[in-house]
Amino acid sequence: ESAPRVATIIPTWQEEEHIERCLRSLMLQSYPATAHQILVIDGGSTDSTVEIVDRLAKESRELDGPEIILLENPARFVPHARNLALEYLQPDTEYILEMIGHAWVPADHIQIRVERMQKIEGEIGRKIGGLGSIVIESDLPLQKVGKWIEATLSCPLGGSGQFARFKKEGPTKTP
């Protein structure tokens, strides 16, 4: 039985310091490369983000790694990037992961996400809409924007860290 097709969507803007680590972590997944497509949707970076993505897309092709596609997002914002990515998905895509260009994942990340999704779907007898994962603190210093995001998510208007409340595996109701 072949592995379900997975697409990883990565909206980017000015990610030259992080995008290589992000993409390499996806290129080195234990999940079959033939069943994994990576869509990087760039919002007009003026640093070397686009050049790094182009270089890694070529490298991944040469190494029979996952397909990496770079798309231009003229609207710049993440919701537009998501919508644009949907137009480029392979028709047999079953699962979509979204990452940020600052993130990287362990080599078994996609394999574990797909297995858990299939397990939960099998238990409840239907497809489900989403699967979260625990965010592990970075080993890099938190930059200004990261500090803003952290402060926003932990304040009452940002949800007071609601995402951290859901720790069990399985279907759950969200507020």
Regions found by a protein language model. Give the residues of each.
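Cell-envelope/extracellular polymer assembly enzymes that use nucleotide-activated donors
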Residues: R5-A7, Q37
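Acidic helix N-cap motif at the loop->helix transition within catalytic regions
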Residues: E17-E20, D47-L56, D108
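Short, acidic, metal-binding catalytic loop of nucleotide-sugar glycosyltransferases
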Residues: R24-A35
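Short beta-strand-to-loop acidic/aromatic patch adjacent to the donor-nucleotide binding site
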Residues: T93-W104
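Conserved donor NDP-sugar-binding/catalytic core segment of glycosyltransferases
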Residues: D108-K147
